[in-house]
Design a protein with these regions (language model features):
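Conserved PLP-enzyme active-site core in the AAT-like
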Residues: 2-190, 196, 202, 271-275, ...
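Generic structural motif
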Residues: 102, 131-133, 226-228, 263-265
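PLP-dependent enzyme catalytic core of the Aspartate aminotransferase-like
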Residues: 7-10, 67-68, 73-75, 171, ...
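Conserved small-domain helix->loop->beta segment predominantly found in fold-type I
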Residues: 163-164, 180-254
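Short, hydrophobic/proline-enriched secondary-structure or compact coil segments at domain edges
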Residues: 60, 219-221, 258
Length: 286
């Protein structure tokens, strides 16, 4: 069972290597590891579904509708919260900012560990707080008490999580590096209409990103192929490139979002180049 642990001295009785976690997350002062329903509530909380006012900002997060709001492309956003709401940033694709809510002008930062480390960690969320009081307020707002936050986790997943967290800095930097290379490739491809990624020099947000994002620019790249996006993407989905593999999702407006994994940069670029050059016929896509 995994329980929130506010001091990181232990995470319930799982025996996770918390010292290794803290070695990578030096900016984290207090936080919680959530599983099951409490994790879901933390990742999808908003002012309408929680007990108390929350001002939720999503960073590099693509909504199910496919819309991408301006805030979602600005993980370094530091705008003040309105009223007395608890400022919450849900990090999906902004791994360098895990456990650094203060840098983003937030009280709480929530990271989807499934998005960070792959399918083996689906259903787990990591919550970092500016203070113990902010963490307590957030857990109360999402209705997650110490006992309620418990959920069964397979022992193998537990051990793998401890290892992955100890490698967090390397994992996040690698994925960000791959995303930057992919974005640069896509930005200069004649069959790509536009690319949005804060690490690109020509991106409107690049100047602010370089001032505020010293550990990388996230691992999601949004772009618009000139041809049918669904045929391009479904060809890539046929063969995952690795354990934490890059993938492309298609938005309703025909744009695509690349989620980079841990493959070699040349493999990611090669897969994109092949997909753009030889998209599958739309009728062959499920």
């Amino acid at each position: 069972m995994l329980h929130p642990d506010r001091n990181f001295s232990t995470i319930a009785s799982q025996g996770l290597a918390v010292e290794q976690v803290m070695a990578q997350l030096e900016h984290a002062k207090t936080g919680a590891l959530l599983a099951g329903e409490p994790a879901r509530r933390a990742l999808f909380c908003d002012a309408d579904t929680c007990v108390e006012p929350l001002e939720v900002r999503r960073t590099l997060h693509v909504e199910p509708t496919g819309s991408i709001e301006a805030d979602e492309l600005r993980p370094w956003l530091k705008a003040p919260a309105s009223g007395d709401g608890l400022r919450v940033v849900v990090n999906e694709g902004a791994g360098p900012y895990l456990c650094r809510p203060a840098q983003m002008g937030a009280d709480i930062a929530v990271e989807d560990l499934g998005d960070l480390f792959g399918e083996a960690f689906e259903g787990l969320a990591f919550v970092a707080a500016r203070s113990g009081g902010a963490l307590e307020r957030f857990l109360r707002a999402i209705g997650a008490g110490a006992l309620d936050a418990a959920a069964p986790v397979l022992p193998g997943v537990r051990d793998l999580l401890a290892h992955m967290l100890s490698q967090l800095a390397l994992v996040t930097q690698t994925r960000c590096d791959r995303a930057l290379v992919a974005a640069q490739f896509l930005a200069h491809h004649p069959r790509v209409v536009w690319v949005r990624y804060p690490g690109l020099a020509e991106d409107a947000s690049n100047a602010e990103a370089r001032r505020s994002m010293e550990h990388g620019f996230g691992w999601r790249v949004t772009f618009k192929p000139a041809e049918d996006a669904r045929g391009f993407a479904c060809g890539l989905w046929e063969g995952p490139l690795g354990a934490l593999s890059s993938r492309v999702e298609v938005l309703p407006d025909g744009a695509c979002v690349l989620h980079t994994g841990l493959e070699e940069a040349l493999d990611v670029v090669g897969a994109l180049e092949k997909g753009i050059a030889c998209p599958k016929p739309t009728e062959d896509c499920a």
